[in-house]
Amino acid sequence: MLGNELSKSDVEKEISEKGEYMQIHYLSGLLNKEIHRDTKKFIYLKLIEIYKKKNMLNDVAKMYEGIAGISIAFSEQIKNYLKATEYYIKAGFFDKADYSMRKALNEANSVEREEINFSVKDFYKKQAEEYERNLKRNSATRIYEKLLEMNITDSERKEIKERLIELYEKLGKLKEFYAMKKFEEKEFSRL
């Protein structure tokens, strides 16, 4: 079956005998064809499933962006752009995460914007904590530095700076360590 007549069961049947990389090739090729929106969404979801198994997080994020692009409901667009943002953060592509977040914010009302900002902040924090657990200190440092650029509360800012000071010391980044330490002392003396 080709075109708009291609159904989910046709796709499922076609990929059932193929290996994962052949499934990726076949499904990716279908995305370029004119097919029904529901079938296209099914294909994106199948690709997400495969990419997650292969830990191809950047590609997972791209598929979520694809779903958002074909979605009609604003809530679904926001949800999928937010998922894309999460996976771009996990993959370490912060610029792409910012771009995807801006797309979600463009579709959101003021209440949803607050929720989106909170969620994205949470994604960054969780990823930084995971990096710290896995002793990927340099990656954790990059995320904490990114968080400092975001709209965060004073208590969050203080906590992040304390974490950064600790990480800079462990990484031997003395210049950054002393600069942050000096900045912290200045901030503390103002209180």
PLM segments and residue spans:
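"A position-specific structural signal for the A-helix of alpha-solenoid helical repeats
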Residues: 9, 26-29, 45-46, 66, ...
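Residue-level signature for tetratricopeptide repeat
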Residues: 13-14, 29-33, 50, 63, ...
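Terminal, low-structured helical/coil segments at or just beyond the last alpha-helical repeat
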Residues: 163, 170-191
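Alpha-solenoid helical repeat scaffolds
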Residues: 41-46, 78-82, 95-99, 115-118, ...
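Inward-facing hydrophobic residues that define packing positions of alpha-helical scaffold repeats
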Residues: 27-28, 44, 64-65, 81, ...
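Flexible helix-coil transition and linker loops at the boundaries of alpha-helical arrays
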Residues: 29-40, 53-54, 69-77, 90, ...
